[in-house]
Amino acid sequence: MEKYILSIDQGTTSTRVIVFNKDGEIKGVSQREFTQHFPKAGWVEHDANEIWSTVLSCFASVLTESNIRPDQIAGIGITNQRETAVVWDKNTERPIYNAIVWQSRQTQEICNDLKDKGLEDEFREKTGLLLDPYFSGTKVKWILDNVEGAREKAENGDLLFGTIDSWLVWKLSGCKEHVTDYSNASRTLMYNIHELKWDEQLLEYLTVPASMLPEVRPSSEVYGKTANHHFFGHQIPIAGIAGDQQAALFGQACFESGEAKNTYGTGCFMLMNTGEKAVKSENGLLTTLAYGIDGKVNYALEGSIFVAGSAIQWLRDGMRMIQSAPQSEEYATNVTDADGVYVVPAFVGLGTPYWDSEARGAVFGLTRGTQKEHFIRATLESLAYQTRDVLDAMEKDSKIEVKTLRVDGGAVKNDFLMQFQSDILDVPVERPEINETTALGAAYLAGLAVGYWKSKDEIRNRWNLEKQFDPKMDETKREDLYKGWQTAVKATQVFKK
């Protein structure tokens, strides 16, 4: 009987469940979108129960459509939108408030207050993160401070906190297992990434009781089994967990120090494996845990670019210059260059390495000769320039030269963008045959834990190249173009809202 691994890819706008076979091939996919809640400007929330419902719905449809029985599933892996925080009552088994999403800015005042107390350096030193609403810790504090009766319940030990992976494992296991993995714990602002434990001092600053927190476990391990009522009585091992970007790093087989991947989604997230050493960034990067497996942990440097694929959506929906995302490539290749035009898509500020939340988008270099094609090309090029910003910071911090960049996500289908990316980095760009690297990474972690795959070497050998883009641009042109980008970013930062 052929066996499979089932991967839950719980994202920001939808949940997907994907079934993989031994060769890492996709045998079935099911996807469900869910509601985005915006209670106030800058706030983003999800209904955690609705997310759970989408998971169950995807389970049912993917098994039915792929004609796979529950007893053929060897294990379940989970990858998730990181930082999004859920607080639930362990007695009623229900969330006490909506999940506060990673994008939500509703805890800015809490962050400002902690900064005013001079605590930013301590948080940075222990967690590798910035004091920013992006991360989970201040979201948990906000819920305890703002939901009636929450703090009292928390002090009495009745409330549990988890990132989305924790919530799903708890529900899948019939409310038995309250766990998370190293990669997700490292995004909470409450976990000491050097000592590998929840940090009592940071919890005190955030006024979060330790009793709420999940047990932190390796990313590849059997955490428990599914409850009898989920898969017609079949108890399936829940065996792999990683935050979405770390799962993509694993799915891209970036197991060695210096290996890096860039995911081109709504934004771009670039991670470089730094091995068993946590590298402190002096250049605006985050230090994070990549994964824990085989009794040890790997660290990573991470750069966040806020606007990537969403810039292409903006060309389509906001500027109405294109009718579909693939059309951007056609227009970009109709001209030989951007004719001196630079688009800085700082629609929600600038991420790594600038961390300038006040910056706003700008366009430079327009002349009477500027055409729509130049504007579209310059927008695509901005994704590559921002990636260069991050890669340069990574090489400075790690003292490691990146030899190749592995890529995944929706925008990597754009051959023009991938070639320009290689040119502006002066590094080969590798696009894999299987683009679903996030879900695949979670599947690999689960499969290793249950013996479905034997080793990381076996997984590395299963990684297949679809296309490699080699740099073709001469150094003078490359550096001139990049210098223009740096000038444009500086000018953008001068013009504040």
Swiss-Prot record:
Binding residues annotated for ATP, in chain numbering: T12, T13, S14, T266, G309, Q313, G410
Protein's name in the database: Glycerol kinase
UniProt entry tagged with the keyword Transferase: yes
PROSITE patterns with a match to the protein in the record: FGGY_KINASES_1, FGGY_KINASES_2
Regulation of its function: Activated by phosphorylation and inhibited by fructose 1,6-bisphosphate (FBP).
One GO term describing the cellular component: cytosol
Species classification: Bacteria, Bacillati, Bacillota, Bacilli, Bacillales
Assigned keywords, A-Z: ATP-binding, Glycerol metabolism, Kinase, Nucleotide-binding, Phosphoprotein, Transferase
Family recorded in the similarity comment: Belongs to the FGGY kinase family.
EC number assigned by the record: 2.7.1.30
Function: Key enzyme in the regulation of glycerol uptake and metabolism. Catalyzes the phosphorylation of glycerol to yield sn-glycerol 3-phosphate.
Binding site for sn-glycerol 3-phosphate: T12, R82, E83, Y134, D244
Family matches, as SUPFAM superfamilies: Actin-like ATPase domain
Pathway membership: Polyol metabolism; glycerol degradation via glycerol kinase pathway; sn-glycerol 3-phosphate from glycerol: step 1/1
Gene3D superfamilies in alphabetical order: 3.30.420.40
UniProt PTM comment: The phosphoenolpyruvate-dependent sugar phosphotransferase system (PTS), including enzyme I, and histidine-containing protein (HPr) are required for the phosphorylation, which leads to the activation of the enzyme.
Annotated binding of glycerol, by residue: R82, E83, Y134, D244, Q245
Keyword Transferase (UniProt): yes
